[in-house]
Regions:
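Aromatic "clamp/platform" in nucleotide-sugar-dependent glycosyltransferases that forms part
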Residues: 250, 269
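Conserved donor-binding/catalytic core segment of Leloir-type glycosyltransferases
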Residues: 4, 182-208
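Short His-centered aromatic/hydrophobic patch
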Residues: 94-100, 118
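Conserved acidic donor-binding segment of nucleotide-sugar-dependent glycosyltransferases
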Residues: 55, 301-303, 307-314, 323-328, ...
Length: 361
């Protein structure tokens, strides 16, 4: 089977990691795999040599002029279509909503099937009337759709029998499988994600500042890069926490550091299905997460495998972190229950479900 993935680039991020991991698995299981990107062929994550990467690179499409933007998008569709036909793909998977509509239009009147994916929160992400209309419109023109959660499928009116499927995120980071909970955890609180507004790292930093004096020696490490970096650095300096809050940048091996943390925190306003939280739970790191739409409450049973807090509440985040740090027995219970996800969300299991599904399209 000739399988294609369509994604903007192969930088660091959840969709990018999922793309690379699925592509690697498919290639190692006798499938021909191609990845089509918009911006370059370099991958942040290790990519098997068996996987080919092609670039439909037209540079940055001008956003200010509607006509130029439209012309640029049309050119890109034809660039993708050319690659699809040259490689004779059986299926092209759009690894986001934007990539899904490109996949649909690029495969019109070809033998290639288009499969869409919903990786964000369709109820909240750019939730304009036009965006909602386009999401649902292109959904019906795909040959299949993969959802990460039941809630996402409900947004589109439920599954269309065998054409659609709900497949939760796998633990795509292979390093996770090689790690065991440490005998003694370090005085570290960790978070991982792009430094963008919806991740609410400002909220986490504020929460940490509320309990910093009560947990001497503890430090907060945030792994990731993004547009909010300068604002977060200013916040850290304003709160007098330069020696205790570290913006550690993007690091593909951050998971090894997280494994030793006393607490992992996800502070987002909303998510699709957070890879970083899934990995931390599977490693047995005691976790705190906002009860944001779609994702955390499908991974965490509150008080059993982690702690869920109200979205936007720095006070609750602070209290939850403190509860874990001050109660070792409670932290151990969260660790043991969270680690059960290592089996249910293994890359072998989830990737096999993906491949079996694609063969039915």
């Amino acid at each position: 089977m000739k399988i294609g993935f369509l994604i903007k680039d192969l930088s660091s991020g959840g969709a990018e990691r999922a793309t690379v991991s699925l592509a690697n698995y498919f290639a190692l299981h006798s499938q021909d795999v191609e990845i089509i990107t918009f911006n370059g062929s370099d991958s942040f994550y290790p990519l098997e040599e068996l996987v080919s990467v092609h670039t439909a690179d037209l540079g940055e499409i001008e956003q200010s002029a509607s006509l130029k933007r439209l012309i640029g998008s049309v050119k890109r569709i034809f660039a993708i279509r050319k690659i699809v036909k040259q490689r004779n793909l059986d299926v092209l998977i759009g690894m986001s909503f934007a990539m899904t509509w490109y996949a649909v239009l690029a495969t019109v009147f070809t033998r290639t099937k288009s499969v869409g994916t919903e990786r964000s929160n369709p109820y909240r992400y750019k939730a304009t009337k036009l965006n909602t209309f386009l999401r649902k419109l292109f959904y019906y023109f795909t040959d299949g759709y993969v959802f990460q959660t039941k809630r996402a499928a409900e947004f589109f009116g439920g599954k269309r029998s065998s054409r659609d499927i709900i497949i939760p995120n796998a633990i795509f980071n292979e390093t996770v499988y090689t790690l065991s909970p440490p005998a003694e955890r370090k005085k570290i609180i960790c978070a991982v994600g792009r430094l963008i507004k919806l991740k609410r790292f400002d909220l986490l930093i504020d929460a940490f500042s509320q309990i910093a004096d009560r947990i001497p020696g503890y430090m907060l490490f945030i792994f990731g890069e993004g547009e909010e970096k300068d604002d977060l650095e200013n916040q850290i300096e304003y709160l007098g926490l330069k020696d205790r809050v570290i913006l550690a940048g993007a690091d593909p091996q951050a998971v090894k550091f997280v494994n030793y943390a006393s607490v992992f925190v996800l502070s987002s306003d909303f998510e699709g299905m957070p890879n970083a939280l899934l990995e931390a739970l599977a490693m047995g790191v005691p976790c705190v997460s906002t009860r944001c739409e779609m994702g955390p409450d499908e991974l965490i049973e509150d008080g059993i495998s982690g702690i869920l807090t109200d979205v936007g509440s720095s006070e609750q985040l602070a209290e939850a972190m403190l509860e874990i740090i001050e109660n070792p027995d409670f932290a151990k219970k969260l660790s043991e229950n969270g680690r059960k996800l290592l089996k249910t969300h293994s890359i072998e299991n989830i990737s096999r479900i993906w491949l079996d599904y694609l063969k039915t399209i």
